[in-house]
């Protein structure tokens, strides 16, 4: 893959083989984010788990102290009074079977998070093969199947994100935008890492946090020393 001039210049700013403290790594990532738009800062965490085993799955949610910097569109499946509650709480789309049909018939994906009341899951379940592969299926573990719609919607809008380990044993999450600056990014990073560490499965053996890499949308990866997160 051919790399651009800015990317290659960024590589000269630090030692790609070295592991840095979280503080130093964010400094470097901000210096290497040279694109002419507000780049997202991403975190990739390789875990010492085998995701093929059900007892070594790692997933959860965390509210980023400073949000993601992205405006999040929320779709809610609810009826009656619960639909009114969702609208009042700021949901972007609210409906029931008619929205299930719209997604089935139109392949409609103009939303980032899907929330449903438990009584709607019979209908929403029909969308499993459509929403599942995109990570959009409502799930009680992530707080997106609930009758407390006001709380769920407000948390999501405030910067609640879901994380889950992929087949390769890696968690990918955004921790904010370049424009946040160092302190806010550092606080978001540490909130995510605190949540991931607390999600360690009892069945995981050996070193849990194998490696950490921070990067901007267009920039190179910067390694973080797992012993220098906090």
From Swiss-Prot:
Q: Which Pfam families does this one have?
A: Ribosomal_L1
Which GO BP terms apply? regulation of translation; translation
Tell me where the signal peptide lies: none
User: CDD domains, alphabetically?
Assistant: Ribosomal_L1
Keyword annotations for this protein?
A: Repressor, Ribonucleoprotein, Ribosomal protein, RNA-binding, rRNA-binding, Translation regulation, tRNA-binding
Question: How does the annotation summarize its subunit structure?
Answer: Part of the 50S ribosomal subunit.
Q: Which family does it belong to?
A: Belongs to the universal ribosomal protein uL1 family.
Q: What is this protein called?
A: Large ribosomal subunit protein uL1
Q: Which organism is it from?
A: Thermoanaerobacter pseudethanolicus (strain ATCC 33223 / 39E) (Clostridium thermohydrosulfuricum)
| Gene name as annotated | rplA
